[in-house]
Regions:
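Adenosine-phosphate binding glycine-rich loop
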Residues: 258-259, 264-309
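Positively charged, low-complexity intrinsically disordered leader regions
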Residues: 1-66
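Rossmann-like adenosine-cofactor binding region
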Residues: 199-276
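Phosphate-coordination loops involved in phosphoryl transfer and adenosine-cofactor binding
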Residues: 44-49, 156-160, 258
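Phosphate/diphosphate ligand-binding glycine-rich loop within oxidoreductases
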Residues: 38-146, 269
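Glycine-rich phosphate/diphosphate-binding loop of Rossmann-like nucleotide-binding domains
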Residues: 54-66, 150-224
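A short helix->loop->beta-strand "cap" motif at the edges of active sites that frequently abuts
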Residues: 125, 183-185, 254-260
C-alpha cells in the first residue's frame, strides 16, 4: 500500500502532491463508508487518540472525534480550561503525561503558531495540527480542495480567490499552499489592512476590488473577520466591510458566469456572506462539512498505518 511521506500532519507545506492525492483517494473510500447504514469500520481498534484543544472549537473538534470513532479508535478528549495547564504545567509535560497512558496519536489545536512542530520534536507520538494560531490549518485546506475537486472535477487550472481576513487566517495560508501544490491559480482579496506584507512572496495575485476578484475566479472561499485575534481596528465598521467585501445575491447575479461559493465556518451571516448566498445551490458549505469527516478519517488512517509498522 502507498504511504504518506510524513509521520505527522503539521502543515500543508510539509506535504508532497502525491501525499494529497493519496489522502484524497483514501477519503473517496471513506466517504462511501460514512454514507452506509452502518458507518463504522474496525480499522483502528488498537489505536488511542487524544484530542487536545487549547482553543475553542465546535466543527473541527466534532469532525475529528466523529472521524476517530468511525474508525473504531479509542478517543480521549482534553480541555485546557479544566486541565493542569491552568496551574502552569508546560505543553510538553501535559502531552507526555497523556502519552504515558499509552496514547498513539495527538490531535492538537493551540493558539501559538508552530506548536505542533515544536511538540513533534519532543514527544513520541504522531501529531495532527488542528490549527496553530494564525499559522496553518491543514485538514481544513485538504477538505476545501477535496470539495473543489468533487464539485469541478479537478483543482488543477482553476482560479480560486480567498476573500476576507487573510492576515489572521490559518485557513488562508494552508489553502494557498494546498491549491498551488495541486496546480490552481490563487488570488487573495480583502482590505489592505487585512493582507499580510509577505503575501505577494507566496506567488498569489492580490486584489482589493471584490467584483474584479469574483469576475476572475471559478471558486470564492469566503473567510470571516477574526475579531478575537485583533487588538486594534482594521477597518472603520462592520457595515463598511460588508459593503466592500461581502458577497450577496445581487453581486453574484451581476457576474457573467456562475461561481462556486465556499466558507470554512463559522459564518457571520450578513457580514462576509448573506443567507441567500450561503443557502444557495452555488454554495458547497455543507459539502465541506461532510467532506471534513472523510478527509480526517483518511489522514488519521494513513498516519496510524505508519504507527503500526
Amino acid at each position: 500500500m502507498s504511504e504518506l511521506s510524513v509521520n505527522h500532519l503539521l502543515g500543508i507545506k510539509y506535504l508532497k502532491e502525491r501525499d494529497i492525492e493519496l489522502i484524497f483517494e483514501t477519503a473517496d473510500q471513506f466517504k462511501e463508508v460514512i454514507n452506509r447504514p452502518i458507518k463504522k469500520v474496525p480499522s483502528l481498534r488498537d489505536i488511542t487518540i487524544a484530542n487536545l484543544f487549547f482553543e475553542n472549537s465546535t466543527r473541527t473538534k466534532l469532525s475529528f472525534e466523529l472521524a476517530e470513532k468511525r474508525l473504531s479508535a479509542d478517543v480521549i478528549n482534553f480541555s485546557a480550561a479544566q486541565s493542569s495547564v491552568k496551574k502552569g504545567e508546560t505543553l510538553i509535560d501535559t502531552v507526555n503525561n497523556i502519552l504515558s497512558m499509552k496514547v498513539d496519536m495527538v490531535v492538537m489545536r493551540h493558539p501559538n503558531p508552530g506548536a505542533g512542530v515544536f511538540l513533534s520534536k519532543h514527544v513520541n507520538a504522531s501529531i495532527i495540527n488542528a490549527g496553530d494560531g494564525a499559522h496553518e490549518h491543514p485538514t481544513q485546506a485538504l477538505l476545501d480542495t477535496y470539495s473543489i475537486r468533487e464539485k469541478l472535477g479537478s483543482v488543477k487550472g482553476k482560479n480560486v480567490v480567498i476573500v476576507g481576513d487573510i492576515l489572521h487566517s490559518r485557513v488562508a495560508l494552508s489553502n494557498i499552499y494546498a491549491l498551488q501544490l495541486q496546480g490552481a491559480k490563487v488570488m487573495v482579496c480583502g482590505p489592505k489592512t487585512l493582507l499580510p506584507k509577505y503575501i505577494k512572496d507566496l506567488g498569489v495575485k492580490v486584489e482589493t476590488n471584490l467584483k474584479k476578484a469574483l469576475e476572475w475566479c471559478d471558486v470564492a472561499n469566503m473567510l470571516r473577520v477574526q475579531n478575537e485575534r485583533m487588538d486594534i481596528s482594521y477597518f472603520p465598521s462592520t457595515r463598511e466591510y460588508t459593503q466592500q467585501f461581502g458577497v450577496n445575491k445581487e453581486l453574484l447575479n451581476s457576474l457573467d458566469k456562475e461561481i462556486v461559493i465556499m466558507h470554512p465556518g463559522p459564518i457571520n451571516r450578513g457580514v462576509e456572506i448573506t443567507s441567500d448566498v450561503a443557502d444557495s445551490k452555488q454554495a458547497i458549505i455543507l459539502n465541506q462539512v461532510e467532506n471534513g469527516v472523510a478527509i480526517r478519517m483518511a489522514v488519521i488512517y494513513l498516519l496510524a498505518s505508519k504507527i503500526k509498522q
